[in-house]
Amino acid sequence: MHILTTTSASLDDLAEPVDLRQTPADVVALSFTDSDLSGLAAAWKADAERLPSMRLAALRDLRHPMSVDLWIDSVARHAKVILVRILGGYDWWRYGCDQLAAVARERGIKLALLPGESHDEDLRLIEGSTLPRAELDALLGYFREGGPANMTALVKRLARLAGSDTAVAEPVRVPKAGYYQPGHGVVPLPLEGRVRPQAGGGVLRDTRRHPEERPQEETLSPVV
């Protein structure tokens, strides 16, 4: 009988080294999600002339340790502010977190390591960051609410951290459900009192018309 030799490898081990060839910037942001990066890019481009320079990168391109080292040497170590949002938390980008934490402390960089899941708390990310806990919570709040207005406010807050005199706005709550009314914008759809539990499980919707409701023939769509 022959015993087969087996080996295991993580995604980081299987990834190929990549040199992103980015140039340095005052503000740097990394994320696993395209929606984060596209939202930040749009917000920065809308007011680029008055904002500090910014670089964005996808964490999926920085999975190999050599890729991380190259990027830190060419970009991160020259930044004033670095924001990283990690889907899956510390364990999904352990090497990058550790290296950035060391460089940030060595060079006095403001580092925010945030969880990708907005309601989760990862103490290892908090400990690796150089910003106060209150500032980390505030930065995460923009992602938690989402939307163009909050991405714009987030970019301005990062600019302020980088030394700009840009005015800072707190995260704005975005309705979890609603509909778009031409000429008025997004109209929230109140959820309180609209459903009630039934015996044996499930819920029963309150079908009574409310003043803010649209006629039944018009379709209500969730706010994205």
Whereabouts are the PLM-identified features?
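An N-terminal assembly and electron-transfer interface module characteristic of large anaerobic redox
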Residues: M1-R194, R205-T207, P215-V224
